[in-house]
Amino acid sequence: EYNNAKGVECYERLKGKAAKSAGPIHTMSTGISYALIDKSAQDKLPLAMMGYGRTDAVDGSVFPYAFPLVTTYQMQASAIVKFIKDKNGGNLAGKKIVYLYHDSAYGKEAIIAMEAEASLNKFQLVQIPVAHPGNEQGAQWLKIRQEKPDYVVFWGWGVMNQTALKAAQKVGYPRDKMIGSWWTGSEEDVVPAGDAAKGYMAATWNVAGKDVPVIADIEKVVYGAGKGNLQDKSKIGTILYNRGVSAAVLSVEAIRKGQEKYGKGKALNGEQTRWALENLDITDARLKAIGATNLLPQIKTSCDNHEGSGKVKIQQWDGAKWVPVSDWIEGNKALIHPLFQASAKQYAKEKGITPRDCSKEK
């Protein structure tokens, strides 16, 4: 259920505990993040928005307590365009790309990036919204059939995802020309679509599978000892399971970083956790040390970059599993980050916020 009010209610219940011992609060929703941005800053409790929005919170000078870590919708969209461009000999001029999106804050976040990429790369962009929940897409796919796009970039959520894949099959649109966001790229999105999903691609900021050492260790040490609480153990190693482990990695690494500064074993408050999130430096060497090699990309945050990476991989569903078909791809930072900064500057103006001087932050 996509319900922002319940997310705010959950935050209000938790914030008393969080103020005393605050790890980052994972909202798991762009809409909930928007609802909590101002409130969490007032409460001095950091929000972790891994892979989602509000995307202009990359600018920590304006949003000190909001962290769209790893990547954002706009950088993800840019990386998808780069992947398509590389598939077409580095030239998208004259191509047509449909942006099919969930008509919500989530779906709308990437529009500005797609428009910027279309202007830069000279391709035609066709925007097609889908009303929530997305289980009716007949009109949208009729339009796609009429438009005959070279690619469909897909920003779906929930039942919208399997519906789109089945609709694409029905109108004869090739699924290997569809590339979705990470909210459209889990096993739960493709398995219900059956054969209609085969060949479909999606971006991801974490890999699937059990060949990541920490995932294999969890299965062996935790579930092997009968201590796990996951009823369906086949979920271990899936995209969403590994994403949860990725969130745990970043949360624990933030606490470790904070304790390096404020005292080993110390329960951090919100301000101290905020500092830690803003000073993350998770290198490949560190990922290897904790058994998370290739689980997610390197992360290095700062006052003016609360994202820390901007990279995704593209994966393809082969009918049984997700298979990576790219290395880590970084979106066009030179194109996209000024969009964040302009949006953050406008937000600061509207809210009467004086941005921090990042040159003075350490």
Predicted regions and their residues:
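Extracellular/periplasmic periplasmic-binding protein-like sensory domains
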Residues: 168-248, 343
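Structural recognition of the beta-strand scaffold that forms the well-ordered cores
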Residues: 22-27, 46-51, 66-68, 96-101, ...
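Venus flytrap/periplasmic-binding-protein-like
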Residues: 47-49, 53-58, 133, 174-193, ...
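Segments of small-molecule ligand-sensing domains
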Residues: 229-241, 252-327, 331
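Extracytoplasmic "Venus flytrap"/periplasmic binding protein-like
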Residues: 12-26, 31-49, 59-67, 146, ...
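Sec-exported extracytoplasmic/periplasmic mature domains
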Residues: 12-20, 37-45, 85-90, 115-123, ...
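Acidic helix-start/capping segments at beta-turn-to-alpha-helix junctions
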Residues: 1-4
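Extracellular/periplasmic Venus flytrap/periplasmic-binding protein
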Residues: 6, 12, 16, 55-56, ...
